[in-house]
Structure formats: C-alpha cells, structure tokens
C-alpha cells in the first residue's frame, strides 16, 4: 500500500472543517508538559540516510534479549520448532496476506488452503466444523461465550480460574458491555477446577461453562466427563480451551462431548511474537454452525463438475448484515491459519504425537531432577501435567528469575504478574526445543542460585 502524506492544502481544508486555525491549536487541550515530553521521546533526526537509520534500529534492537537465552517460558505462548518448509510456503506471494477473500469464490488457492486448515483442526479436535480462524485465543474464548448466549438465550457464563488470566481479562471486556454475568470457579487443592463449586454455581440460567485443559498452571483436568454431565444437565454449553500440541497424547475434546473448542494456535508453526500475530482456533458441533463467528470455507461442485471452494453461510457475517452478524471478525489471521495448516499437514498425526511425547517426557525429567537433586517444592505436587508446572521459590520470584537471567536463562513466568498473592511461585514450561543439556544446565544454575551443596 502506497503512503502519501497530507499536502498543506489538505491539512488546511481539514482544519477549516473542524474550525481550528492550526495544528498547534488542535492539540492545545493536551498539557504542555506532556506534549514536550512526547516531543523529546519521539524526536527523530531530520531525514537520516537509509544506512544510518538501519544502524540506529540495530542499536535499539540490542536491548532485546532472547536468541542467546535458554527459555522455559510458556503460559500460552510456546517455543516450538518451526520447520523451514512451513516458512517457505507461508511466504508464497499468493498467501502473504492476512485477508480472507470477500468474494465467495475468488482466490481458489487461498480458499482451498483455509478449507484444509478447517479440516485439519476438525481432525485434531474431533469436532465437526471449524471456522477460518480468529485473532487469538482470548478473543476466541469471548466469541465462544457469546455463541453460548446466542444458542441458549441465557446470559450467564461460568469460567474456571484455571483459564489463562489474560483470556479471562479479554472475556470480561467482551461480556461486561453486553450485560452478561460472569462467575469464576476456584481450583481445588490439586489445581483442578473445583467440581463441588461448579455444582453450587451452575443453574438453569447458565449459558456456558468454560474450562481449560491443560489449565494455565499446567494441570490436566481429570474430571471433564463428570463436569460435562453436570453442564449438560443444566442445558448449558461445554466450552473447552485447548493447547493443540497436547492433543498428540491427550484425548480429543469430542470424547468429552464438548460443544465448542477454542484455543491458541501459535504452537502450530507460528513464531513467538510480542503481540502476535497469533491464531484463534474455534471448532464446534455441526448443529451450531450458523452461530459460528467469522469466515467458513466450504467445498462444492461448479457447473462444469469441478471441485471448488467458497465462502459459505455469509449471511452470518458483518459485511453482509452488520447489525445482525454473529461477530465483527473481519480481517482474521488467515496467513497464520495457513501456516498452521502446513505445519499440521507436514507433521501428520504421528509427528504431532511425537512432539507431544517429547514435551511431556522432558518436562517430567526436569521436575524429577528438581525434586530429587534440589528438593524443590511444587505447588500442585499430586496433579497430572503435560509440559508445565509451578514451583515455589525461597524469595520473591522476580528477584529469583533475575538471578537466572544473569546466567542467560529465562527461567519461567512469575505468577505475581497475574496474582499478587503468588509472589513466590514460578510457572515453568518445557518443549521439544529444550534439550536434555539445557535442562541439566537449568538445574545446575538453580542449584547455584539456591546455594545448594
């Protein structure tokens, strides 16, 4: 897209239209102190040469850390290996856009790729239909909650406190402006959703119950079937947030009779990025297809008998009837969805299972080493987990992690970032990118920090 700055004449016309004499007057409501500070912070040299500008950016980028650090960060964004082929296909000029086409049948290549993505998500989750993707998991959770309200006609949503706190924050933002009640369930002593609390809280007024498996603290929910029975007994919808890679070894959501599956697709071949772009997964039962937000690509046969692909059921969408649309999802993450499709097709079921097994085994190897070598205390020692767990620290977790950072280790997420009362707890994640050597170095470094003999 070309960039053409406003001409002096255009600026004058705009100022005249709003009845302002100058740009200075336009911003006069902002205190001079703040304006001056902004000028200092964003001051640029006059028309730098390209080489000077690149050098300046290079110097600024040195403030970032990451490439030379061993990472044990998780909490919804994971450092998985991305095969070169995924990057190659994703950068094809025909795919290199975030847009799904508006015209029902234009861009057959893009439409087929999105159709394959939808099919692969259905294979992974066991669900019947999937959409063409959403922005990320947070908005996906919110859209699923709104789906439950539309389908049931009820305006009360229950969510487990085991759901990623950032997703809960997004959910609150969506629901509060639509006057939908949100109730949050506590966890039990093992870090699982308290089923007794669910029994007390759920009612005929509940539209949907949202759980996450594995949950934010890495704990695997073992009572999903019992909770599913309880949810459907009250004519509510069962919504489950997933970690896609974990489905390589965990049962698919369909086996728990889940109504709507949502999740963060970043682990499926999408690079880590501060702010994205990531990928919101949403899949559901066929009976709810007309309430799905966003695009849906379908397969059809044209007049000449050839297989083709189209945007289907478009009357649900905001560009057809904005006031009655199921959502305002428009420019979705189609490029991220295509990357995920290439990743899943390349690895296949066996490949995803293998990655899940490696994540599982190395995380358990680390926990075992921490327990036996260092006597580390765990927050949920008796719970099952996939590739994340929470440890206790002898001092403030941020101070503790800073000491590991000095040894070029990103040791985990301080839970005090989300929960003030958990200032001595760290969430640790392990993926296939963490070699046994890295794990051993982590244990060795922890020993030094703890000053263990």
UniProtKB/Swiss-Prot annotation:
UniProt-listed SUPFAM superfamilies: PLP-dependent transferases (SSF53383)
EC number: 1.4.4.2
UniProt-recorded name of the protein: Probable glycine dehydrogenase (decarboxylating) subunit 1
Gene from which this protein is expressed: gcvPA
A biological-process GO annotation: glycine decarboxylation via glycine cleavage system
InterPro entries reported for this sequence: GcvPA (IPR023010), GDC-P_N (IPR049315), GDC_P (IPR020581), PyrdxlP-dep_Trfase (IPR015424), PyrdxlP-dep_Trfase_major (IPR015421), PyrdxlP-dep_Trfase_small (IPR015422)
Record lineage: Bacteria, Pseudomonadati, Dictyoglomota, Dictyoglomia, Dictyoglomales
Molecular function GO labels: glycine dehydrogenase (decarboxylating) activity
CDD domains registered for this protein in UniProt: GDC-P
Family: Belongs to the GcvP family. N-terminal subunit subfamily.
NCBIfam families to which the protein is assigned, alphabetical: PRK00451.1
Subunit structure: The glycine cleavage system is composed of four proteins: P, T, L and H. In this organism, the P 'protein' is a heterodimer of two subunits.
């Amino acid at each position: 897209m070309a960039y053409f700055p406003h001409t002096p004449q255009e600026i004058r016309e705009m100022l005249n239209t709003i009845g302002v004499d100058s740009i200075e007057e336009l911003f006069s409501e902002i205190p001079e102190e703040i304006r001056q500070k902004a000028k200092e912070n964003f001051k640029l040299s006059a028309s730098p040469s390209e080489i000077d500008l690149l050098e300046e950016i290079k110097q600024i980028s040195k403030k970032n850390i990451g490439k030379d650090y061993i990472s044990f960060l998780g909490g919804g964004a994971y450092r998985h290996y991305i095969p070169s082929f995924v990057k190659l296909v994703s950068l094809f000029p025909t795919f290199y856009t975030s847009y799904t086409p508006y015209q029902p049948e234009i861009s057959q290549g893009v439409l087929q790729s999105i159709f394959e993505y939808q099919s692969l998500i259905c294979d992974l989750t066991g669900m019947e239909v999937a959409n063409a993707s959403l922005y990320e998991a947070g908005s996906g959770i919110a859209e699923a909650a709104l789906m439950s309200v539309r389908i049931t006609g009820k305006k009360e949503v229950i969510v487990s406190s085991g759901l990623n706190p950032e997703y809960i924050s997004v959910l609150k933002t969506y629901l509060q402006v639509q006057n939908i009640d949100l109730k949050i369930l506590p966890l039990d002593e093992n870090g699982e959703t308290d089923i007794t609390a669910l029994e007390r809280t759920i009612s005929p007024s509940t539209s949907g119950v949202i759980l996450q498996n594995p949950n934010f603290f890495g704990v695997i929910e073992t009572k999903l079937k019992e909770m599913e029975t309880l949810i459907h007994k009250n004519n509510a919808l069962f919504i489950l947030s997933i970690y896609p890679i974990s489905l390589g070894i965990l049962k698919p959501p369909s086996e728990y009779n889940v109504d709507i599956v949502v999740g963060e697709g970043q682990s499926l071949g999408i690079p880590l990025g501060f702010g994205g772009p990531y990928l919101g997964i949403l899949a559901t039962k066929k009976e709810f297809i007309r309430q799905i937000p966003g695009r849906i690509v379908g397969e059809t046969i044209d007049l000449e008998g050839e297989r083709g692909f189209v945007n289907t059921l478009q009357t649900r969408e905001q560009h057809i009837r904005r006031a009655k649309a199921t959502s305002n999802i428009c420019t979705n993450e189609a490029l991220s969805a295509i990357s995920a499709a290439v990743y899943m097709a390349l690895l296949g079921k066996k490949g995803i299972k293998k990655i899940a097994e490696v994540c599982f085994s190395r995380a358990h190897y680390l926990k075992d080493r921490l327990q036996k070598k260092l006597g580390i205390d765990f927050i949920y020692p008796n719970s099952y987990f996939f590739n994340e767990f929470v440890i206790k620290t002898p001092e403030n977790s941020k101070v503790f992690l800073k000491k590991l950072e000095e040894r070029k280790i990103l040791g985990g997420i301080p839970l005090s970032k989300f929960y003030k009362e958990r200032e001595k707890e760290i969430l640790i994640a392990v993926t296939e990118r963490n070699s046994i050597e890295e794990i051993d170095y982590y244990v060795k470094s922890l020993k030094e920090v703890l000053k263990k003999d």
